[in-house]
Amino acid sequence: MLPVVILFFIFSATGEAYGTCWALWGSDAFHWNGLSIGLSLGAFGICQTLAQALLPGPAVKLLGERAAILVGVAGVSLALTVMAFAGQGWMIFAIMPVFALGGIGVPALQSLATRQVDENSQGQFQGVLASAVSLASIVAPLAFSSLYFLTRQQWPGAIWLSVVAVYGLAVPLVLGLRLKTAERAAMS
């Protein structure tokens, strides 16, 4: 159960980096104005919405929850790495579909999480998960904005590699998750 709570914290914390740093980074890296920043965030939101609405079910059915989570982490990590080194703003729009693969990770994790405890403990478990998400929403913006301001003069894209590093912490946790009966049956 603890690995699932930590994963929720990691995924929530990394999600905070976008809202905290995206506009500053776009302005610093590409001299984007408000319209360009808004268009990029809008494209990001549309891709994420479509991915979360259309991909998790088929991905979990095809790959299983653990692999779907890992595909989500891999897609986001690849996109963030491209963003870190991107030399032109159009590259960010081009990578959005890959970025959207991250949209399958959290729904797969949520599905897996509901089977980690019995029915009688669901309320308590959901409360613990909500607390982890709340803690991430407090800690992550402070951490990522501080790191951004330390690195923005030398390399604004460094912030995205720091997010990849945090996602990297999730991989061994995902690999170590115990599969419950439903996923074992689906993989057979």
Regions found by a protein language model. Name each.
Residues 51-65, 148:
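Helix-to-loop junctions at the C-terminal end of transmembrane segments
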Residues 161-188:
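Multi-pass alpha-helical transporter architecture, strongest
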Residues 104-118:
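Intracellular juxtamembrane helix-capping segments at the cytosolic ends
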Residues 122-150:
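A late C-terminal transmembrane helix in Major Facilitator Superfamily
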Residues 20-37:
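Short amphipathic helix-loop junctions that connect adjacent transmembrane helices
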Residues 146-167:
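A membrane-interface helix-boundary motif in multi-pass transporters
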Residues 67-82:
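Structural signature of the two symmetry-related core transmembrane helices
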Residues 82-96, 105:
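Helix-loop junctions at membrane interfaces in 12-TM secondary transporters
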